[in-house]
Amino acid sequence: MPAKGRYFLNEGEEGPDQDALYEKYQLTSQHGPLLLTLLLVAATACVALIIIAFSQGDPSRHQAILGMAFLVLAVFAALSVLMYVECLLRRWLRALALLTWACLVALGYVLVFDAWTKAACAWEQVPFFLFIVFVVYTLLPFSMRGAVAVGAVSTASHLLVLGSLMGGFTTPSVRVGLQLLANAVIFLCGNLTGAFHKHQMQDASRDLFTYTVKCIQIRRKLRIEKRQQENLLLSVLPAHISMGMKLAIIERLKEHGDRRCMPDNNFHSLYVKRHQNVSILYADIVGFTQLASDCSPKELVVVLNELFGKFDQIAKANECMRIKILGDCYYCVSGLPVSLPTHARNCVKMGLDMCQAIKQVREATGVDINMRVGIHSGNVLCGVIGLRKWQYDVWSHDVSLANRMEAAGVPGRVHITEATLKHLDKAYEVEDGHGQQRDPYLKEMNIRTYLVIDPRSQQPPPPSQHLPRPKGDAALKMRASVRMTRYLESWGAARPFAHLNHRESVSSGETHVPNGRRPKSVPQRHRRTPDRSMSPKGRSEDDSYDDEMLSAIEGLSSTRPCCSKSDDFYTFGSIFLEKGFEREYRLAPIPRARHDFACASLIFVCILLVHVLLMPRTAALGVSFGLVACVLGLVLGLCFATKFSRCCPARGTLCTISERVETQPLLRLTLAVLTIGSLLTVAIINLPLMPFQVPELPVGNETGLLAASSKTRALCEPLPYYTCSCVLGFIACSVFLRMSLEPKVVLLTVALVAYLVLFNLSPCWQWDCCGQGLGNLTKPNGTTSGTPSCSWKDLKTMTNFYLVLFYITLLTLSRQIDYYCRLDCLWKKKFKKEHEEFETMENVNRLLLENVLPAHVAAHFIGDKLNEDWYHQSYDCVCVMFASVPDFKVFYTECDVNKEGLECLRLLNEIIADFDELLLKPKFSGVEKIKTIGSTYMAAAGLSVASGHENQELERQHAHIGVMVEFSIALMSKLDGINRHSFNSFRLRVGINHGPVIAGVIGARKPQYDIWGNTVNVASRMESTGELGKIQVTEETCTILQGLGYSCECRGLINVKGKGELRTYFVCTDTAKFQGLGLN
């Protein structure tokens, strides 16, 4: 899998950055907007109080109220301005919250004490202090502990003040005690519902923040994955080929999921283009075979990577593109993908630089190696064929001729054809190359060749800047491979997949070293990617991520849809722009929805207690509350039936309905409307049923007057608690946080209209028992006073004020909660969508990487831990196979009919792709494709063993050989099928050998997995010296195959280049299909 970086907010990773980000999130998304909402609502309340004061006549009688109201307005106006200064708001947020609370409490107590001596009542400003308690939890930016503390102080202070004042002016009575107890129940209900509301909001806020961060992280990972994907693909393929292949992979993944199989098309996609006027360079290291035999696995990988890394640097400097590495052979092309008029000069210059580099190595280390270079100019077909292990390659007769030029070249010289010479424009001096004398093909085709004279050879050599050549005892004690490795490490070639190892970006983040050299005092094995904080690119990554997070957090503000246009919501953020998403949101399940019903039931209990304590105990009261209790009991039974079923194993329809409360929106909405409607109704239903028979006042009889006053007061005292009950009914609507805004608005509006109508048309107001009339009745002389009582004790006015105040507060709060819920749903959807895209990118990266490296090798370069060491592995027993289609060289022609060879390559692509499809079969899961070389297919078995298990038992080692034979037979069968459909008569020539090999990854610009060793060379010779339609093996391999039940036919002694005479055998393919039983 692609590297999983340590991102800004990892799970379980805490830090000041995370705390600051969460603080910014809370400030922007909740604390700021909610506090601003409270300030606006409270300011509106102050304005309403000022209007009420002026409407009562002489304002001088209400100086305390007016003074406090104007003072609070001024404070709130200043706070509203400070809300837009983020630095001050963040620093003084808690202080501002305390100041706001203190202003509200002070205003409340001014209302309590204003004209207190005129009429003392236990219900003084209970609704207003209930408002303070509720907003402490819902609108003020306190923590849960802080809110509980402030709410408790608000509650206790009111109870203590009212209790002491009531005892100071009147004789303590049971009636006053019951009223104070009812006040305590009301405040307790406000605190509990407020705490429930805050807990729900904190959970929702934390979830929204988590999903927001995850979504941003996924976006960031997605960008990194895309960059890694591009770099990974570009490390194997040129840009003009990679884009089409990448799109094809993504399309395949979308259509077929994660299945690693291609669609069943009649033809496989061909990514090949024709280019004219290019130069092809082949270079072979003479003497490297002897050097490799002396190298340890790591030394071999280091030497190859440093040499070819140096060649890659030379290629880049000379505008050449490396095509492929074949053992110790390196070939590249100039003029791809963009045509260059200097392509021939580029290749010649590169060839001379390569010879010079090898000369420096030879002089510095004393190792007898040299470079043989062949160049030809012409036309090529370039691209990728097959399905697995993509490698950019070139094909044409001109490519084959360039290969011949290298084979017929002279060590240390650049061998060119006449076609290349014509493109040099006399930039270099040349001499006759006599290539026809060294290669029969050149002689047959009458190709005249030349050797380029290096201009540097005619200049005096500069003072040596390289390591001194070891002499004497030092040379005897140090192996050639060691001298070679130590010297080449000073070149500092980049390691394979260095661009994938950086945990945050595709850049390796390494400090640039001039001339590609690394200081010798810093051993390469200890180099590590610098910390991201030290890298300018890392800092820019941090900055961009911070900006993205801050931008996302700004979008979470509940004031944003009101102030600016949103891409996701209509104005005021109550409806999604996308209709399908709106429906999905409304149908989405709501976890823990049953807890809302439990909280609403608690409010019902509190309303019931208030009525039982203070209201006349009539039959209507019992019936109404009994019916609502039955309704709520049924609702709770439906909601918590699954909880109760744990005690009772029987599960029936009730449990089924209970499980659907959180998942079925219609059922949930029905139950919520029924619950809220019941509470709103039962809070007021008994008011019109109260017996309001006002007694007649006796004239001139003070005792009768006081008795009538007492009876009237007894009738009027429940009225303020009906107001409180109605307010608690309003609050019950707000505990259903995830309920849609529209039903809440409808319920609150209908309830408000009904309450205002019932209160204002109630017969209790005909005596004005709680306003001016009560003040008059309390006069000790029995006469009525002309001075009106304080308007803050006028229940009719204040009831309307409190109901409208709570209506506005709950309406704005519900709108913000609805917006939060929609944001939560929106970010979850975005997270899900982007997570799917991220998984697609991961799968694409995996497929790409597995098309470059075997899966067990890919794990070395990617993962949670950085691994910058060389990858190299030695194996004791690996079976290597070369399978070629020699007839394809004859079949391949370049003419107008086959589009200059393109159609011939299309057939080769079908052959290689069909071969690749066999690798998907479980039977051949142990077979690893290494590469294709023209029409030759190279594979190996036994490379996937885990590290430390290379020396496994012989039986399992030998099983790989049988698998490879079966794979070779399957290749022959596939080729027969292609012959039947294409009307050709291609035959496969296969060579197999087994033995020790060294595997490794070399090349930084184009990392390539390869295997080396005598086993590989002999397997290649087995193929090149074999016969069509047969599998040739060595004598050692034959012995093992016979032990597995295969029949082999002795071919005899044959001459193998570099090995002398070897006895070889042909595997009897007719019987192999039936006798390969030892594999199981």
Swiss-Prot record:
Q: Which reaction does it catalyse?
A: ATP = 3',5'-cyclic AMP + diphosphate
Q: Where is this region: Mediates regulation of adenylate cyclase activity by C5 alpha-induced G- beta and gamma pathway?
A: 477-482
Using the UniProt annotation, give all residue ranges assigned to the region (Disordered).
Answer: 454-474, 504-546
Q: How does it sit in the membrane?
A: Multi-pass membrane protein
For the ligand (Mg(2+) 1), the binding residues are D284, D328
Please give the record's comment on domains. The protein contains two modules with six transmembrane helices each; both are required for catalytic activity. Isolated N-terminal or C-terminal guanylate cyclase domains have no catalytic activity, but when they are brought together, enzyme activity is restored. The active site is at the interface of the two domains. Both contribute substrate-binding residues, but the catalytic metal ions are bound exclusively via the N-terminal guanylate cyclase domain.
* Name of the protein: Adenylate cyclase type 7
